[in-house]
Amino acid sequence: MGMRMMFTVFLLVVLATTVVSFTSNRVLDPAFRRRNAAAKASDLIALNARRPECCTHPACHVSNPELCG
């Protein structure tokens, strides 16, 4: 293998390692889970606050069927 090919393989290994470690840290991190749950709750509260206008708007109604029943 030439130097260029070895360098390319090295970069691919580093990239793959970085991606795997980044995603596994996010999945296992309890603080990330709490932040994610808080963000989802905040989004749901915001959607409920605009429920009347969302249910009368066809595009919003289709995107959020759980709000309008």
UniProtKB/Swiss-Prot annotation:
Q: Propeptide ranges, please? A: 22-49
Residues carrying 4-hydroxyproline: P52, P58
How does it get modified post-translation? Answer: Two 4-hydroxyprolines have been detected by MS but the assignment of which of the three prolines is modified is uncertain.
Main location class: secreted
Query: What keywords were assigned to this record?
Result: Acetylcholine receptor inhibiting toxin, Amidation, Cleavage on pair of basic residues, Disulfide bond, Hydroxylation, Neurotoxin, Postsynaptic neurotoxin, Secreted, Signal, Toxin
Cellular location of this protein?
Secreted
GO CC annotation: extracellular region; host cell postsynaptic membrane
Residues bearing the modification Cysteine amide = C68
Alphabetized GO MF terms: acetylcholine receptor inhibitor activity; toxin activity
- The signal sequence is 1-21
InterPro entries hit by this protein: Conotoxin_a-typ
Please describe the organ and tissue distribution of this protein's expression. Expressed by the venom duct.
Q: Where is this region: Lacks the Ser-Xaa-Pro motif that is crucial for potent interaction with nAChR?
A: 56-58
Here the disulfide bonds are C54-C60, C55-C68
Question: Which Pfam families does this chain map to?
Answer: Toxin_8 (PF07365)
The domain comment in this protein's record states: The cysteine framework is I (CC-C-C). Alpha4/7 pattern.
Family stated for the protein in its record = Belongs to the conotoxin A superfamily.
> Other remarks?
Negative results: neither MrIC, Mr1.7b, nor Mr1.7a inhibit alpha-7/CHRNA7, alpha-3-beta-2/CHRNA3-CHRNB2 and alpha-3-beta-4/CHRNA3-CHRNB4 nAChRs endogenously expressed in human SH-SY5Y neuroblastoma cells. MrIC does not activate alpha-3-beta-2/CHRNA3-CHRNB2 and alpha-3-beta-4/CHRNA3-CHRNB4 endogenously expressed in human SH-SY5Y neuroblastoma cells. Mr1.7b does not activate alpha-7 endogenously expressed in human SH-SY5Y neuroblastoma cells.
Q: What is the protein named?
A: Alpha-conotoxin Mr1.7a
